[in-house]
Design a protein with these regions (language model features):
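Short, well-ordered beta-strand elements
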Residues: 36-47, 67-72, 151-155, 185-186
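Pocket-lining segment of extracytoplasmic ligand-binding domains
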Residues: 190-281
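Ligand-binding "clamshell"
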Residues: 102-112, 172, 215-229, 286
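A conserved helix-loop-strand patch within extracytoplasmic ligand-binding domains
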Residues: 115-186, 245
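Short helix-initiation/N-cap motifs at beta->coil->alpha
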Residues: 71-82, 94-97, 179-200, 210-211
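Haloarchaeal acidic low-complexity proteome signature biased toward cell-envelope/secretome components but also
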Residues: 1-36
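Short, polar/charged alpha-helical segment
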Residues: 46-73, 78-79, 100-105, 165-174, ...
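Secondary-structure end/capping motifs
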Residues: 250-327
Length: 346
């Protein structure tokens, strides 16, 4: 599979006083005491952009917190939003759009860390890649329709998801194309559904993150990159770490984000081991170790912690989330982010 030409990128917990911590955390899923016996519930998804969770879990970084961590795996963002609304989640590592939905619904939470930036690629069938002319995108898709008798179909995550919004931005803002006129967009049920749809040639292309592109290459499927997010949306957001206010206003916030940053540093220095951790948590049947390792070499695997690095892209996503009816208003950076936790780290 053709790869885009881009350079590959780049214990301490201060416990709060018992009474103050209990007061500040009233209403939190697991009220965090100072004796380490209580529970912090962390939602995550089995996707590469949640790599920090895999490392924190497998390297024992959660043990540095004065609270036990209960990880809950979800297949999609909307399910995490529902769990957040029910008060079942303290911290969630998932997409920026569902994080915005949580905030827009008035649930007391903010993004305290980013997990990754620019992790998306636009892939198309090899036949279309030969036709693709970025200077005449409408003509390229019309040629496909003329030769195949059908409109080009992108299959990606459901409407309003990070992959979906990135695809719409690429089509509309970058190439002045209209979904439903020049191309069709089909919402699939997640990464595995997208992969199967491509393998069965139900879709002609996709907007997707690792490890799907690497799995496509490993299985010799006829798809390749025609663009990557870094080339048209620098600082593109994806998975983030959303924290409930009851946790965010306690010392636990800094402790958690400190371990998140530590995990990001570990990933940078130990990419193969981090890949093995991802395979262990996700499951080797779904993510074989060799595929996980190869995906780490992808230009889409850009792991970060500083939330400011995705601020510009988040503004674009906020506009699209509102336009698609996922939020009632266009959220500002101030409404979405709390930079103080990261900025306060030693």
């Amino acid at each position: 599979m053709t790869r885009p030409s881009r350079e590959l990128s780049r214990r301490e917990y201060l416990a709060g006083s018992g009474a103050a911590a209990l007061t500040g955390l009233a209403g939190c899923t697991g009220v965090l005491g100072s004796d380490g016996s209580d529970t912090l519930t962390v939602a995550y998804m089995p996707i590469y952009p949640d790599m920090q969770y895999f490392v924190m879990d497998q390297e024992g970084y959660f043990d540095e917190l004065d609270a036990s961590v209960e990880g809950k795996q979800f297949t999609d963002g909307p399910s995490i939003v529902k769990a957040y609304a029910s008060g079942d989640i303290d911290v969630a590592m998932f997409g920026i759009v569902p994080a915005m939905i949580v905030v827009d619904r008035g649930i007391a939470a903010k993004v305290v860390a980013a997990n990754i930036e620019e992790p998306m690629g636009i892939l198309a069938h090899d036949r279309f890649a030969e036709m693709w002319d970025p200077n005449d995108p409408a003509g390229s898709f019309e040629q496909w329709r003329s030769e195949t008798g059908e409109r080009f179909t992108f299959g990606t995550f459901p409407e309003g998801s990070v992959p979906d919004i990135l695809l719409r931005y690429w089509l509309v803002d970058e190439h002045d194309l209209e979904p439903g006129k020049h191309v069709d967009i089909v919402g699939a049920g997640g990464a595995n559904a997208v992969f199967q749809g491509l393998a069965n040639e139900e879709f002609d292309g996709t907007s997707i993150m690792e490890p799907v592109p690497t799995k496509i290459a490993a299985n010799d499927l006829p798809y390749q990159f025609i663009d990557v997010a870094a080339d048209f949306m620098p600082g593109q957001p994806a998975a983030v770490t959303l924290m409930a206010d009851e946790v965010r206003d306690s010392d636990t916030a800094a402790a958690f984000v400190r371990q998140h940053r530590r995990a990001t540093e570990f990933i940078s220095s130990n990419r193969e081991t981090a890949a093995e951790h991802a395979s262990a948590v996700v499951g080797e049947q779904s993510l074989p170790v060799d595929v996980a390792r190869q995906a780490m070499e992808s230009p889409l695997s850009n792991f970060i912690t500083d939330p400011r690095e995705i601020e510009s892209g988040t503004k674009i996503f906020a506009e699209y989330a509102n336009r698609l009816g996922k939020t009632d208003s266009t959220l500002s950076a101030e409404q979405v982010f709390d930079y103080s936790v990261y900025d306060g780290l030693e």
